[in-house]
């Protein structure tokens, strides 16, 4: 079995073992994976808030409501649910922005929210509240226990596929249908 040195910029796909957990049928974009642990954002679990409602919460007047009118805020994970994270293309020059790859960045600053409200932010965004985190080695153990599949980063999966289809589409990239998944690992 091939082992990746880092899961950064990959997606995790939840396996059936996680059906009765917070991570049921989730797809997670891995932001960081290093000697301190792993951080990711669930990209397909919708919050009950929309982006305009989130901006309204920050008392930001939405100048261009059509940009994100129906876009839901996502639940990035069960950790720190009050903290927001925005994945976006292109990167830009925001105050608290971390370049992730090519033209992708994660931003956590209010200036980005203001740009969203006034219509000057990038069109390709994923807004999450909370994140998913693992201690060093924990995620690899979960992968070995058959809790997750991994696939490389795919821009279309992140930004273009409807949230309720991301899990199925992610599995399809591996040539797998949900019906063919097993809860049993194929190794010891």
From Swiss-Prot:
It comes from Hydrogenovibrio crunogenus (strain DSM 25203 / XCL-2) (Thiomicrospira crunogena). HAMAP family: UPF0301 (MF_00758). It holds the Pfam family DUF179. Coiled coil: none annotated. Belongs to the UPF0301 (AlgH) family. InterPro entries: AlgH-like. This is UPF0301 protein Tcr_1827. Gene3D superfamilies: VC0467-like (3.40.1740.10).
């Amino acid at each position: 079995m091939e082992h990746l040195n880092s899961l950064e910029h990959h997606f995790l796909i939840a396996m059936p073992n996680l059906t009765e957990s917070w991570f049921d049928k989730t797809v997670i974009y891995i932001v960081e994976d290093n000697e301190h642990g792993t951080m990711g954002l669930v990209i397909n679990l919708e919050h009950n808030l929309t982006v305009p409602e989130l901006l309204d919460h920050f008392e930001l007047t939405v100048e261009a409501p059509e940009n994100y009118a129906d876009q839901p805020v996502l639940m990035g994970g069960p950790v720190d649910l009050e903290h927001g994270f925005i994945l976006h293309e292109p990167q830009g020059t925001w105050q608290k922005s971390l370049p992730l790859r090519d033209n992708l960045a994660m931003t956590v600053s209010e200036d980005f929210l203001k740009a969203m409200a006034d219509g000057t932010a990038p069109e390709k965004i994923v807004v999450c509240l909370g994140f998913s985190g693992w201690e060093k080695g924990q995620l690899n153990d979960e992968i070995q226990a058959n809790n997750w599949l991994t696939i490389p980063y795919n821009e279309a999966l992140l930004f273009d596929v409807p949230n309720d289809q991301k899990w199925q589409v992610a599995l399809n990239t591996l040539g797998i249908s949900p019906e063919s998944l097993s809860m049993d690992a194929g190794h010891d």
